[in-house]
């Protein structure tokens, strides 16, 4: 499992002109799932993200988690994170999980994040989405389970 995490001042996701998910501040996640991922991977990533200390304390050091600052999470499914661009000029997505399996694991992942005590908004799995955010910092990390 691969997640691109962005600390966000605000974020939203729109499908067909309608906002389907929106957070005031917290973390925006682009979530990629490969066919080798399991529920164990999803749980690991959910716990890691909830507890990563990437928000500043009073002295400006990254000492607080999204839980500590009472932030929220906007989670977007993103199969293109497993695009392989090493050959040719068109990405190969063979490493991305098949849609049925990916949707199950994506839903499971979001529930695991909620179990950590976070409010989670989502996009619409498999839809063409417009994602808007104000990246705070910017702080952008890639979190992987393997």
UniProtKB/Swiss-Prot annotation:
The SS bond pairs are: none
UniProt GO cellular component terms: cytoplasm
Protein's cellular compartments: Cytoplasm
Residues forming the motif Gly-cisPro motif, important for rejection of L-amino acids are 137-138
| Keywords associated with the record | Cytoplasm, Hydrolase, RNA-binding, tRNA-binding
The catalytic activity of this protein is classed by the Enzyme Commission as: 3.1.1.96
GO biological process annotations for this chain's record? D-amino acid catabolic process
Q: Which GO terms describe its molecular function?
A: D-tyrosyl-tRNA(Tyr) deacylase activity; Gly-tRNA(Ala) deacylase activity; Ser(Gly)-tRNA(Ala) hydrolase activity; tRNA binding
Give the source's domain of life in one word.
Bacteria
Coiled-coil residues? none
| Assembly and binders | Homodimer.
Give the similarity note: Belongs to the DTD family.
PANTHER family of this UniProt entry?
Answer: D-AMINOACYL-TRNA DEACYLASE 1 (PTHR10472:SF5), D-TYROSYL-TRNA TYR DEACYLASE (PTHR10472)
| Role, per record | An aminoacyl-tRNA editing enzyme that deacylates mischarged D-aminoacyl-tRNAs. Also deacylates mischarged glycyl-tRNA(Ala), protecting cells against glycine mischarging by AlaRS. Acts via tRNA-based rather than protein-based catalysis; rejects L-amino acids rather than detecting D-amino acids in the active site. By recycling D-aminoacyl-tRNA to D-amino acids and free tRNA molecules, this enzyme counteracts the toxicity associated with the formation of D-aminoacyl-tRNA entities in vivo and helps enforce protein L-homochirality.
This chain belongs to the protein called D-aminoacyl-tRNA deacylase
Q: Which gene encodes it?
A: dtd
